[in-house]
């Protein structure tokens, strides 16, 4: 369906198991292009009607539960790692892991990292599943790699509202695995 694993089978199973009649979909900007395809798939494979949130979405702390309360039985929130928060509407988080092969890009990256020996590796939810592979590749090429973590993040993960996982890593350089400017800018400013 896309460059990301939208885990549609899991979504369909959850909707059918819950018996949800109306489902709200929420996406961060980079994944909104998938909204209509996903909505059509859900409506064709479940008895549910889908409402797509067009509001900006900046993270797991920005679920549209207050806006959708009373209108939907379930929210499917794409692109973020769940936080230990209480939501007004049952919410299913789909992290939307990237399907991209980063090997060729890592080879190019290695050239730019030539002058650095200790690298802090950071990413967003979409690439967390690749971190061990990337770390191994860099270490196999003579680099020392550090992964930080903090409360409410996984190892190597930064959130748009929480960059503390990169604190005190004592790295010479930060290697961000992801797309866009938002998270790298936050890393730079932190």
What are these regions (language model features)?
Residues 1-190:
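An N-terminal assembly and electron-transfer interface module characteristic of large anaerobic redox
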């Amino acid at each position: 369906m896309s460059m990301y694993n939208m885990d549609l089978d899991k979504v369909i199973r959850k909707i059918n198991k819950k018996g949800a009649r109306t489902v709200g979909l929420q996406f961060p900007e980079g994944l909104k292009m998938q909204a209509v395809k996903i909505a059509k798939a859900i409506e064709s494979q479940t008895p549910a009607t889908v409402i797509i949130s067009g509001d900006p979405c900046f993270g797991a702390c920005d679920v549209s539960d207050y806006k959708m309360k009373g209108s939907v039985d379930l929210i499917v929130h794409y692109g973020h790692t769940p936080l230990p928060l209480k939501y007004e509407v049952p919410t299913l988080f789909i992290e939307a892991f990237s399907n991209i092969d980063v090997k060729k890009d890592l080879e190019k990256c290695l050239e730019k990292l030539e002058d650095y020996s200790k690298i802090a590796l950071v990413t967003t939810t979409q690439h967390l599943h690749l971190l061990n592979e990337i770390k191994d590749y860099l270490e196999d090429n003579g680099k020392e790699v550090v992964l930080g973590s903090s409360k409410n993040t996984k190892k190597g993960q930064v959130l748009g509202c929480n960059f503390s996982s990169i604190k005190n890593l004592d790295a010479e350089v930060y290697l961000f695995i992801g797309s866009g400017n938002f998270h790298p800018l936050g890393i730079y400013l932190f």
